[in-house]
Amino acid sequence: MAASALDSAWEGLTGSFTEFQLATVVTFLLHETVFFLSGLPSLLFERFGLFAKYKIQKKSNTPSYQNRCVLRLILYHVCVNLPVMVLSYPAFKFMGLRSSLPLPHWTVIVSQVLFYFVLEDFIFYWGHRALHTKWLYKHVHSVHHEYATPFGLTSEYAHPAEILFLGFATIVGPALTGPHLFTLWLWMVLRVLETVEAHSGYHFPWSPSNFLPLYGGSDFHDYHHRVLYTKSGNYASTFVYMDWLFGTDKDYRNAKAIEEKDGKHL
């Protein structure tokens, strides 16, 4: 029954918009809705001092600094993200993107999304490490690190060149598999929620990293923002095993060991 209801809803959606509109404008609006609704809470928590005991860093951004981030994000999203969605549609269509019924079986959806997460994490890790080389950091990646004390919305605050560079890691999986638009939307939503959580600046008892062994999360990524760029490590986007395999989490692990020994948070 749930499947038939979803099919009916999808049929109504595809009957109201063209596939081009769904893959571009509607995708953009879905991204903006999920991104800002999931990212605003940590901004408000920081601004009004809520859940202070769960805040990873004691420092906070000023309201004007937060507002600056939001305004630039809107500019970047409209001037970079939306045009990229429009221009990449023919390529996705060529690679097999479809929006028609039937919707893919749940096993196909799950397997594809898991593949996207693993592939994105691998590509992002190496791309992110490259961005921490001296020249690229100075001219590109330093924009993202303007917020040494991150909050959810800073997850997508970056130089336009970085948006395109690391954005490749997000779209290469779907481009390879030619997914159904429904799967693409689910992947986008989950990826947005993941990166917003990783940049939230808060580590709660219910944070995903407390339950998912290989998941990095907010504490893992917050360390990356608060130390010198040449020593930050923790380059992967979602999981921890890439940093563990290549030894780029050693400083973080040492810091956590000292923190646990002293019984206090860094």
From Swiss-Prot:
It is a multi-pass membrane protein. Keywords: Endoplasmic reticulum, Lyase, Membrane, NADP, Transmembrane, Transmembrane helix. GO terms for biological process: 4-alpha-methyl-delta7-sterol oxidation; sterol biosynthetic process. Residues 113-248 form the Fatty acid hydroxylase domain. Its EC number is 4.1.99.5. It catalyses: a long-chain fatty aldehyde + 2 NADPH + O2 + H(+) = a long-chain alkane + formate + 2 NADP(+) + H2O. Belongs to the sterol desaturase family. This is Very-long-chain aldehyde decarbonylase GL1-11. It comes from Oryza sativa subsp. japonica (Rice).
